[in-house]
Amino acid sequence: MATQDFLVELGTEELPPKALKPLSDAFTQGIVKGLEEAGVAFGAVESFAAPRRLAVRIRDLADAQPDKSVEKRGPAVKAAFDDSGNPTRALTGFATSLGITPDQLDTMETDKGAWLVYRTVEKGKPTVELMPDLVEKSLAALPIPKRMRWGAWKTEFVRPVHWLILLYGNKVIEAPVMNLKPGNKTRGHRFHCPKELIVPTPADYEVVLKQEGYVLADFAERREQIRAGVAALAEKEAGGKAVIDEDLLDEVTALNEWPVPLMGRFEDRFLEVPAEALISSMKEHQKYFHVVDASDNMLPLFITVANLESKDPSQVISGNEKVIRPRLSDAAFFYETDRKTRLEDRIESLKPIVFQDKLGSIYDKSVRVAALAKKIAEAINSDPALAERAAMLAKTDLVTEMVLEFTDLQGIMGQYYAANDGEHEDVAKALNEQYMPRFAGDDLPTTLTGCAVAIADRIDSLVGLFGINQPPSGTRDPFALRRASLGVLRIIIERQLPLDLQTVCEWAEQNFTVLTENNTASTVVDYMLDRFRAHYDEQGICAEVYLAVHARRPTRPLDFDRRVKAVEAFRQLPEAQALAGANKRVSNILTKQGGDSIGETVDTALLQDAAEKTLAAKVEEQAQQVLPMFEQGDYASALTSLASLREPVDTFFDEVMVMADDDAVRNNRLALLNRLRNLFLRVADISLLPTAG
């Protein structure tokens, strides 16, 4: 089958920068999905995304769908003809529905008799007929929360669309998409090349735009050019290092078709303002990269990326310097003003701010968190007074001018202002660390005071919201409780804190008077333990290992984690699958025979067969060895030791009839199996692990 390259380009007004890459990815995926569903063969797929265009190129796209063999079964032969051999209504009706005559049907033999069948080959549709509808559907399915109309058309898109390329080889596909007539003409840079440019073939697309149109259409190429240019400029002009935030880099890439980095300067006096405030101002409002020296100290420099090659770059730089100066002046003013009021004097200002209608104000939450943080601090051998103080001050920076203007600085400015007020160093740090980790893989609190406040704040939210029956749903999690749960688990595990979730949640529950749900603490603990699954999935630990531990519901995260690591190590042992299978068999037997009512005291006088005597002796020997390991939380060593039971367990099941006729013998054997299983259950339910076969 012949192949040619295909190109679609949608020319628009400037697309939302944060949406550009997701739109491009979704557009590409939609076209690929459509081709796969249509059964059209294709080669490499390339995406292009710039401020005024979305494009996809498909290499080696087949010129048609493959022909398809079709088989349609009709009536049974005995129902197709009457006694005289004439076609029945069943046969003629079937043939008529297909637009054929009965003599065009074949006979198919099956185990249920002979049937008439129509066999034919459906010709595949030409690709040029398929692509317009496929592109239209891909565009309609893009994740656009708010679409707009323009002109007299009813067509909707995220921004007005002005031109369209649909090329297959060197031929334009003449079929409208989004009420636009396709062509082979694109448009260059809005200022450097404000005219139409002919794209002869799909292979010429980005070359024409780059060489004639002053447009780098490839998002990844443009992104790396900006990264390299910004880094080189910082080193060349200032001997410094540009700090490149990846999200900002994506946004700047989406704003520029022809990026040109330029360096500007601001007054040294602004460096007296915390660097985070300067960075936030430059990043959020102006999309500037900041520059640091070899010691990572901020320099009074910034790098902006212009979307054109100016004849007078100094004018562009000067313009940007004039724009940033008022922004930085505002930050300096906020910083100076905020420091005139101590954080403790702002506590009363938290009372009008609602946390949640039923759970009260931010002030109410602060009081609860302070009480809980104090208890947590005591439990982790930290200073409870510092934790209580930090929790009461934790949200006070929310009412400062700086944080009201730059919300991403919450906690960060709290630390600066607390230090300015002369608060204890750990208290000041805790005001920032309360929000850690802010995202997956983020840093954790470095101080125990910070750990106590971070955990207390999250647990208070979890218990409060679950307690008024407002847990997260499948689509809504407005208070980010999933992230809060994972944050608590990470802090406890990675900082190795001896905390029990059940206890902490019960402490939190005691601080509320408005909860309506029963067993809130246990419900929250179950929810948090369920979050462990995603935590371990990211680490490549299989679900069965998590489920084996989860079945025992250990409520100390550190203990839970040690068990998971131990079971994961046990799973790699050669004895693991056999012992998992044996545990599953034992579990089934015990469940059928009464489960919890079965004891585990073995009467050696009732042991008859050599295999059960050996197993009983080995189980008792292992019990003496592993019980101290359990007490120390050394689950890995315990499971490694218990792996030696594989051989006597296998022999027992090969040679011993558990369900003996004699009640006493039978019950004794059940007790032996129960004792065996309970040893493993001290760690996890390994019957849930994969078994041999």
Swiss-Prot record:
One of its GO terms (cellular component) is cytosol. PROSITE patterns: AA_TRNA_LIGASE_II_GLYAB. InterPro entries: DALR_anticod-bd, Gly-tRNA-synth_bsu, Gly-tRNA-synth_heterodimer. Its main location: cytoplasm. Residues 65-84 are annotated as: Disordered. Residues 65-74 have a biased composition (Basic and acidic residues). The keyword Protein biosynthesis applies. GO terms for molecular function: arginine-tRNA ligase activity; ATP binding; glycine-tRNA ligase activity. It is an enzyme of class 6 (ligase). Pfam families: DALR_1 (PF05746), tRNA_synt_2f (PF02092). GO terms for biological process: arginyl-tRNA aminoacylation; glycyl-tRNA aminoacylation. It catalyses: tRNA(Gly) + glycine + ATP = glycyl-tRNA(Gly) + AMP + diphosphate. Its EC number is 6.1.1.14. It is found in: Cytoplasm. Keywords: Aminoacyl-tRNA synthetase, ATP-binding, Cytoplasm, Ligase, Nucleotide-binding, Protein biosynthesis. Belongs to the class-II aminoacyl-tRNA synthetase family. Tetramer of two alpha and two beta subunits. NCBIfam families: glyS. This is Glycine--tRNA ligase beta subunit. The gene is glyS.
